[in-house]
């Protein structure tokens, strides 16, 4: 690997699923998913297709927010997660949408939600806002 290639690799943003595997984040993630029923393996492990997380300020607090989706099925199975600034807590919502034409055309009307990490109403509002900002969410 050349020096320029190494520099480029070092500056590549970490995806949400990669972040979940890092020390500090992984322990918090395991606490969130522990005891959750009907949680698919990709969601339980925090592995899947994802983008780099972003810092979001909500109600005066900073959170690292990202999304992860089931590989090869992102439109129907995805989740948004929010880590506290100190990495001591994570909340999430897993969204499942039936694989039918009407559900894919109007996902908000057919979505099933699974809340993770016992989010309060304010955290649910923040995670819901993330879902609603998804392209084609109607």
Language-model features and meaning:
Residues 56-59, 83-89:
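A short, structured loop/turn motif at beta-sheet edges
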Residues 91-98:
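Catalytic Cys-His active-site segments of thiol-dependent hydrolases/isopeptidases
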Residues 65-71, 94:
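Short beta-strand segments that buttress and anchor functional surface loops
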Residues 9-65, 138:
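N-terminal secretory signal peptides
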Residues 4-7:
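N-terminal signal peptide c-region/cleavage motif recognized by signal peptidases
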Residues 11-29, 99-138:
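C-terminal partner/receptor-binding element of secreted or periplasmic proteins
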Residues 66, 88-90, 110-111:
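Acidic/His-rich structured neighborhood in mature extracellular/periplasmic domains
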Residues 73-80:
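Short, surface-exposed coil-to-beta transition loops
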């Amino acid at each position: 690997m050349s020096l320029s290639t190494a520099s480029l690799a070092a500056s590549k943003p970490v995806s949400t699923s990669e972040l979940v595997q890092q020390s500090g984040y992984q322990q918090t993630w395991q606490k969130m998913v522990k005891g959750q029923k009907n949680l698919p393996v990709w969601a339980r492990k925090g592995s899947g297709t994802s983008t780099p997380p972003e810092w979001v300020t909500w109600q005066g607090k900073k959170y690292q927010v990202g999304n992860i989706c089931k590989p090869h099925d992102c439109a129907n199975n995805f989740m948004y997660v929010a880590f506290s600034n100190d990495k001591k807590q994570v909340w999430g919502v897993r969204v499942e949408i039936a694989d039918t034409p009407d559900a894919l055309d109007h996902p908000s009307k057919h979505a099933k939600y699974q809340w993770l990490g016992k989010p309060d109403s304010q955290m649910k509002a923040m995670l819901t806002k993330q879902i609603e900002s998804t392209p084609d969410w109607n």
